[in-house]
């Protein structure tokens, strides 16, 4: 197959996104799961803050081809994957407290070596479903194991979790939806986790 990319239109869209960044102070990242045509990474990197990756191979691609902020999330990281991720990523998000604690020694060791320390985050589950028709992969659906609920986080804190070492929260609950559903989800995040947000460095 032949993929034809209109760089003029791509640049126009990138300028719009860059304008949002300039006006708001937010960072906008390329989700490689949706677009990984790395021949365009040098162009994209001129306008966006970096990339998000869903695992080691996407993180490696971003590191090699764009070289900007490199954020990675995966439901579970293998020990051998983490060995490389701490070298090439600056933001690593964990799906559970147990995953975070398991890999914490490598995160701490890498922080002492790297000029740009790794920023560790947790994926949260705001328990606010806005999807219809595809509940089977709704991260906020009943029985979902994607993200940490407030009750689970409270239990971890009661058992000694030091939240001061967590730089940010990440939630990923929308699929082909618009800002109205994002607004509902943000309201739920504030209702469930609002008392913790102001101690964080970032919210993704």
Segments and roles (model prediction):
Residues 1-3:
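Generic N-terminal amphipathic, Lys/Arg-enriched alpha-helix
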Residues 26-202:
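Active-site-proximal beta-alpha core segment in soluble small-molecule metabolic enzymes
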Residues 10-13, 17, 189:
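Alpha-helical packing segments of well-folded alpha/beta enzyme cores
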């Amino acid at each position: 197959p032949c993929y034809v990319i209109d760089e003029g239109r791509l640049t126009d869209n990138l300028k719009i996104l860059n304008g949002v960044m300039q006006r708001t102070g937010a960072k906008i990242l390329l989700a490689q799961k949706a677009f990984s045509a790395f021949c365009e990474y040098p162009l994209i990197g001129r306008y966006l803050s970096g990339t998000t990756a869903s695992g080691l191979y996407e993180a490696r691609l971003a590191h090699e081809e764009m070289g900007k902020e490199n954020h990675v999330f995966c439901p579970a990281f293998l020990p051998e994957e983490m060995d490389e991720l701490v070298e090439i990523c600056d933001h690593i998000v964990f799906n559970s407290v147990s995953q975070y604690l398991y890999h914490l020694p490598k995160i701490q060791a890498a922080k002492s070596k790297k000029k740009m320390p790794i920023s560790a985050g947790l994926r949260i589950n705001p328990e606010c479903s806005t999807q219809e028709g595809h509940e089977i992969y709704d991260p906020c659906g009943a029985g979902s194991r994607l993200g940490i609920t407030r009750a689970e986080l409270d239990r971890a804190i009661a058992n000694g979790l030091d939240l001061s070492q967590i730089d940010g929260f990440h939630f990923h609950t929308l699929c082909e939806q618009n800002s109205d559903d994002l607004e509902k989800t943000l309201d739920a995040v504030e209702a469930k986790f609002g008392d913790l947000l102001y101690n964080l460095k970032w919210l993704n």
